[in-house]
Amino acid sequence: MINAFGRRMKNMLTIMLAIMMISICQHASADGKKVAESPAVTLLESRRDMKGIKDMKLEGFMLKMAKGAMKKSPVVAISDNLDRMYIFAIEDASEMDEVHFRADAEKVLAGYTKVAEVVEDHATTILYINGQVGDTFNEMIMYVTRPGTSMMIFQGEFTTDHLVKMNEISERQRKERKTTKR
């Protein structure tokens, strides 16, 4: 009697585990489709083989490892909600390649909502989201132009509160840099 009950329980647990795995796989493939549809990610993927490009995609374990380094940047405000992160930087590319990339990036970023722009020394940093301020959004893009262009794409579940926290940290760090320069 006990053995039959144990076998039934084992079978039920196996079925429940299989259902959970199918559910997880469906959720992961839905996330994969969402990423593939992102115009900013598509732009970065199309430029991946360009000379002078440094790019990195962080997700899963690699993203968890990188969270320690994020503690010193404004990104710490969103690190708990971050699912995926793309980093793309033009360092040694030809000037013409960089001009073409900037033109393509500006076309893609026109479809996003511009949230903030900071001009410091020789660099301009612009923050975009794929939604409206006040809504929940799942993609945030930090676009930096200077000698060399870089773009960081953050994917996850974000709110306006995350933007406010990032801005507060950024302002505090900017003030600290100005006082140390003097």
Annotated model-derived regions:
Residues M1-M9:
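N-terminal secretory signal peptides that target proteins for export/translocation
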Residues K33-F101:
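Early exported N-terminus immediately downstream of N-terminal targeting peptides
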Residues M50-I53, D80-M85, A110, H122-T124, ...:
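Extracytoplasmic
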Residues Y128-L163:
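A short, solvent-exposed beta-edge/loop patch
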